C-alpha cells in the first residue's frame, strides 16, 4: 500500500522503504539523514524512542504534538527540533525545510538534540533515574 502511494505521487527514486533495519545499522542511517521526522498521528505513540536514537547521533527532530503522549516532551520544541500539530502535512514540511535549509538553525537544533540526549537519555542517566524511582518506592513501602 505504501509503495503504491509512493508510485502514484511520482516519488519513486526519492522515497525508499527500508523494511527492518538492525540495531547495528541504525547509526549509519541516522548519520545519512539531515533531519529526523516522526510524523506519527497515533495516540498510541507513547514516547517515540526513535527520536532519542536520532538525537544520540546529533540529528535535529521534527515531531508531532500528540496529545497525552511523551513525543513532544522528548523533542523539546525549539531546543532539539520543532514540534507541529499532528496531521498538518504543510506544517510538517515547513518545519523540515526550516531546519534543512538554514545552516544556523540546523547547527542549533543538532547541538540541542545531542545535548538533550546526553543530559536525559544516555543509558547511564536512564538507569540512574530508574534506580532513583525504585529507591523512592522502597522508602515509601518501609514507612
Where are these regions (language model features)?
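Short acidic/histidine- and often glycine-rich active-site loop of Leloir-type glycosyltransferases
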Residues: 65-83
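Short alpha-helical segment that forms part of, or immediately flanks, the ligand-binding pocket
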Residues: 27, 45, 49-56, 72-73, ...
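Acidic donor-binding loop of glycosyltransferase active sites
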Residues: 31-46, 59
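Short alpha-helical donor nucleotide-sugar binding micro-motif in glycosyltransferases
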Residues: 20-21, 28-33
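Conserved acidic donor-binding segment of nucleotide-sugar-dependent glycosyltransferases
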Residues: 77-89, 97-104
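A short, well-ordered alpha-helix in the C-terminal region of glycosyltransferases
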Residues: 91, 98, 105-120, 126-132, ...
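Short hydrophobic beta-strand element within catalytic cores of glycosyltransferases
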Residues: 57-65
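Nucleotide-activated donor-binding/catalytic signature segment of Leloir-type glycosyltransferases, i.e.
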Residues: 3-21
Amino acid at each position: 500500500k505504501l509503495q503504491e502511494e509512493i508510485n502514484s505521487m511520482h516519488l519513486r527514486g526519492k522515497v525508499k522503504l527500508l523494511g527492518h533495519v538492525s540495531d547495528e545499522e541504525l547509526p549509519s542511517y541516522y548519520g545519512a539523514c539531515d533531519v529526523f521526522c516522526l510524523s506519527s498521528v497515533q495516540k498510541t505513540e507513547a514516547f517515540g524512542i526513535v527520536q532519542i536514537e536520532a538525537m544520540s547521533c546529533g540529528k535535529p527532530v521534527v515531531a508531532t504534538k500528540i496529545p497525552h503522549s511523551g513525543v513532544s516532551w522528548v523533542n523539546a520544541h525549539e531546543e532539539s527540533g520543532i514540534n507541529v500539530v499532528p496531521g498538518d502535512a504543510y506544517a510538517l514540511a515547513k518545519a523540515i525545510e526550516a531546519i534543512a535549509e538554514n545552516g544556523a538553525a540546523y547547527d542549533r537544533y543538532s547541538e540541542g538534540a545531542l545535548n538533550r540526549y546526553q543530559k536525559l537519555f544516555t543509558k547511564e542517566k536512564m538507569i540512574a533515574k530508574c534506580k532513583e524511582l525504585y529507591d523512592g518506592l522502597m522508602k515509601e513501602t518501609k514507612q
